[in-house]
Amino acid sequence: MSILQSVHNSFVPIHKEGYPFIVAFFVISLILGWIWSPLFWCGLILTVWCIYFFRDPDRVIPLNSNWVMSPADGRISFVESCVPPEELGLGKDEMIRISIFMDIFSCHINRIPISGTVESILYHPGRFTNAEFDKASQFNERNGVVIESKHGKIGIVQIAGMFARRIVCWSKENDAVITGERFGLIRFGSRLDIYIPTEMKLRVAVGQTAIAGETVLGSFDDKSATTDFRYD
């Protein structure tokens, strides 16, 4: 491996969704510096933070169709059994809900938790209250994604937070998706809820830190193991 390749591999990629924000922050830094030089450094700090926010690191993703992987980086804030939101069309039976809160320092790239087919995409406008509040799933701006997997339907809800002002979802209805595939992001602080059939055995708890594509939320087969991984 050449020195240039080594240097290139040491840098975490930046997602293209962040380019306009990074450029805007840097231009503002230059303008502020022209007005008063110390302000340039304040703007530069915000620019560096913006670069960090939109980082898009590759992950080591286990290839096991019986495992449900975390769809987001962040802290697990809720784990409970409840009836999923009616808007998802998942019926009235209880499912396991796991909520993952992403603060402004988390990587905000969202990933598919289990392989399957995208059955529906459901966007709902709403408020921008603190995403840590339980009721944020009912009142905040949100985007629902329902995946038909071999273990049944699984619902994912991207929820905008206090500072988030746009939910991005790249997946489309009828798309075939695989575990760990990038499907969207939420800008500047947010939450992601995932609804899973109760047959799944939990492997996480409230307060735990999750890593998208790498943390196993639960399994549909306790004896299932994997030795295969994908780097993406």
Swiss-Prot record:
PTM per Swiss-Prot/TrEMBL: Is synthesized initially as an inactive proenzyme. Formation of the active enzyme involves a self-maturation process in which the active site pyruvoyl group is generated from an internal serine residue via an autocatalytic post-translational modification. Two non-identical subunits are generated from the proenzyme in this reaction, and the pyruvate is formed at the N-terminus of the alpha chain, which is derived from the carboxyl end of the proenzyme.
Residues with the Pyruvic acid (Ser) modification: 190
GO terms under cellular component: plasma membrane
Chain positions of site Cleavage (non-hydrolytic): 189-190
UniProt-listed InterPro entries: PS_Dcarbxylase, PSD-A
Catalytic residues (UniProt): 190 (schiff-base intermediate with substrate)
Cofactor info, note text: Binds 1 pyruvoyl group covalently per subunit.
Entry annotated with the keyword Lyase: yes
PANTHER family referenced in this protein's UniProt entry, alphabetically: ARCHAETIDYLSERINE DECARBOXYLASE PROENZYME-RELATED
HAMAP family noted in UniProt: PS_decarb_PSD_A
Name assigned to this protein: Phosphatidylserine decarboxylase proenzyme
Species assigned in the record: Bartonella tribocorum (strain CIP 105476 / IBS 506)
